Regions:
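Short, basic, low-complexity termini and linkers enriched in Ser/Thr/Gly/Pro
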Residues: 1-12
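Compositionally biased, intrinsically disordered low-complexity regions enriched in proline and serine
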Residues: 2, 23-24, 159, 174
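N-terminal beta1-alpha1-beta2 submodule of the flavodoxin-like/Rossmannoid cofactor-binding fold
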Residues: 11-116, 170, 177-210
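Short, glycine-/small-residue-rich phosphate/pyrophosphate-handling segment
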Residues: 118-168
Length: 210
């Protein structure tokens, strides 16, 4: 049986949240997540739900107390079920997604079997310490499990003027941050593009949710 393209039209407006799910070790990816959340919250009828994942121990078990000492709560599978859209973020690890986020994504096979995420829009974002540190390969890698889930990829179009002029982060595949370019945090271009991605994702999520 074919599934409908819309995310979940039965959701009440009050529960139409876009999940911003990320892993951040030094805070750069978290800052990007917060900027995307600001863009989501700027769209009437949408709200951002910020969630993170715990680090992994050498034995590849997630190792952390049930509640993080600061910042966003740890994600649960129900966060993915309940959202109408997803922004997924990770710092680059040798051109790939960081292990803690990959570990969490590997636990979503039950959602995949149920088709729980099929038809929901999703965006990706990343941060690196250098300009050519693997941003685009990391963004593309993060898209793969989302496509297996049947999610609809939402990127950044070149109608966003900063995308053509940025000297730091920002790609058509998703928002990004180059840490060494702006040591004080996100550059103005990175900030604008992250917020633009949040607005675009939220707008499309609401349209698909009906």
């Amino acid at each position: 049986n074919s599934r409908p393209l819309t995310a979940n039209p039965s959701l009440p407006m009050a529960s139409r949240e876009v999940l911003v799910l990320y892993y951040s070790r030094h805070g750069a990816t978290r800052a990007l997540a917060q900027a995307i959340a600001q863009g989501i919250d700027a769209v009437p009828g949408a709200a951002a739900r910020l969630r993170t994942v715990p680090p992994v121990a050498p034995l590849v078990e997630q190792a952390a107390p049930p509640v993080p000492p600061e910042g966003a709560p740890y994600a649960e599978l129900r966060d993915l079920e309940e959202c109408i859209g997803l922004a997924l973020g990770s710092p680059t690890r040798f051109g790939n997604v960081a292990a803690p986020l990959k570990h969490f994504l590997d636990s979503t096979s039950g959602l995949w079997l149920a088709g729980a995420l099929a038809g929901k829009p999703a965006s990706v974002f990343t941060s690196t310490s250098s300009m050519h540190g693997g941003q685009e390969s990391t963004l593309l890698t993060m898209m793969l499990p989302l496509m297996h889930h049947g999610m609809l990829i939402v990127g950044l179009p070149y109608t966003e003027a900063e995308l053509a002029t940025t000297r730091s982060g920002g790609t058509p595949y998703g928002a990004s941050h180059v840490a060494h370019v702006s040591a004080g945090g996100l550059s103005e271009e990175e900030l604008r593009l992250a917020r633009a991605l949040g607005r675009r994702l939220a707008t499309i999520s609401l349209r698909l949710a009906g």
